[in-house]
Amino acid sequence: MEHRGVTVWFTGLSGAGKTTISHALAERLKAAGCKLEILDGDIVRTNLTKGLGFSKEDRDENIRRIGFVSHLLTRNGVIVFVSAISPYREIREEVRQRIGDFVEIFVNAPLEECERRDVKGLYQRARAGEIKGFTGIDDPYEAPTNPEVECRTDLEELEESIEKVMKKLTELGYITP
C-alpha cells in the first residue's frame, strides 16, 4: 500500500475507544507495508512529557509536544496516529495548523458509556474527589466542531470505525490501496 505522511489525531473522552481503534487500524496499515508510528497519550506522558501536570497550561504543552513530534514524523513520510484526550479545541486547532497534513478523528461515546468501560476506576476516583481536573467530570471536553471522521463507539462495531477512517484517508489521498 502506498502512503504519504499524515497525522491522524484520535480525540475523545477517556474510555471512548481511541487506543482500541488506533491500534487495530495501525496493525492493518503496518501489515500492508505503511511506515506508521503511534503516539499514545498515556505512554507519551511517561516519557516525552514526564513532569507535566494536568492544569490547562500543562495539558496544552503536552499536546504541543506531541504535535511537534508528529510534525517531524509526518514531514518525513510517516503516518502518525495520536491517541490523546486533548480536551481543548483551540490547542488541537493550533497543532492542525502547524502540521498541515492532519486528520481529526472524534472518537465519541457518551460519558456514561466511558464510565462503564473504565477498567482503571479513574472516573469513580474523579467522582469521589480523589482526582481533580478530570476531563468529563470537573474539567471540560470540547468536542470537535468539524472532524474529518466521527466514530460513535457506543453505536458501531470496531470494524465499522476502522473502515470509516480508512475510507477518509483514502479519499484524502494519504493511502492508496
UniProtKB/Swiss-Prot annotation:
Keywords: ATP-binding, Kinase, Nucleotide-binding, Phosphoprotein, Transferase
Active site: S86 (phosphoserine intermediate)
Catalytic activity: adenosine 5'-phosphosulfate + ATP = 3'-phosphoadenylyl sulfate + ADP + H(+)
Gene3D superfamilies: P-loop containing nucleotide triphosphate hydrolases
SUPFAM superfamilies found in the cross-reference section: P-loop containing nucleoside triphosphate hydrolases
Pathways involved: Sulfur metabolism; hydrogen sulfide biosynthesis; sulfite from sulfate: step 2/3
Annotated positions binding ATP: G12, L13, S14, G15, A16, G17, K18, T19
GO-annotated biological processes: hydrogen sulfide biosynthetic process; sulfate assimilation via adenylyl sulfate reduction; sulfate assimilation, phosphoadenylyl sulfate reduction by phosphoadenylyl-sulfate reductase (thioredoxin)
Source taxon at top rank: Bacteria
Enzyme Commission designation: 2.7.1.25
Entry keyword annotation includes Translocase: no
Molecular function as annotated in GO: adenylylsulfate kinase activity; ATP binding; sulfate adenylyltransferase (ATP) activity
InterPro entries associated with the record: APS_kinase (IPR002891), P-loop_NTPase (IPR027417), Sulf_AdTrans/APS_kinase (IPR050512)
Protein role: Catalyzes the synthesis of activated sulfate.
Protein known as: Adenylyl-sulfate kinase
Organism: Picosynechococcus sp. (strain ATCC 27264 / PCC 7002 / PR-6)
Name of encoding gene: cysC
